[in-house]
Amino acid sequence: MTAQGLIDTTEMYLRTIFELEEEGVVPLRARIAERLSQSGPTVSQTVARMERDGLLHLAGDRQLALSDTGRMLATRVMRKHRLAECLLVSVIQLPWEEVHIEACRWEHVMSESVERRIYELLGRPDRCPHGNVIPGLDELVAGESAAGCQANPDEPMTDAVRDSAGDVRAIVTRITEHVQSDLVLMLKLKRAGIQPGREVLLGAVEGGVRVFGGTAYGADGDANDTDTDGAGVVAPADLPADVAAHVFVSRE
């Protein structure tokens, strides 16, 4: 699933490698081709150019490894992206499910001075509206870091219910970048109350995870966009395994 409006190929590739690392997925050229819907030869040519530019190197196992410069640039573009998402939700009040695609445009044009103003304006957030850590904050403000906000280890919903004898109570912690470009899916998650900070009950079903609980309010406070039974109880939602694997939770 790719976002529309990405205008810088180098930054797009750097951010994709950064995303894969966050998800614990080995960054290979094949994974980039899948994520960005590009052909193998196109990806190989771009990776070769980035290697010549000193942004990454290809290890013996074909894994892509960012150089120090490449990691610095990848961190910056992801920081801009997630700060833009925070602004779009909190100030501009764009619907939660739409902010990722819009932020994909902003991340390539935002200056560091604007980043700092947004960061201070919003009260120094350390996570985006999807629960992901905003990286590289120490570059904006000396001594600042998001490292300490990883309080409890989290895991994909699919792992949380694996080998479980019954339902699992958990808190939604984050939704990975990979699924955020799918507006229909993100709206489904919001309507089911599957958003960061929400308590849910998880059960294994064939081919995926059934999610109970959630909340009658989404992250942007819009109760009308949440599916309830008329009594304020959110209807359960069945997530396919390939979606549930990108929704992380912390077990209670």
Which residues fall in each region the model found?
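A short, conserved structural fragment
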Residues: 51-59
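Basic, amphipathic "hinge/linker" alpha-helix immediately C-terminal to the N-terminal HTH DNA-binding motif
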Residues: 62-81
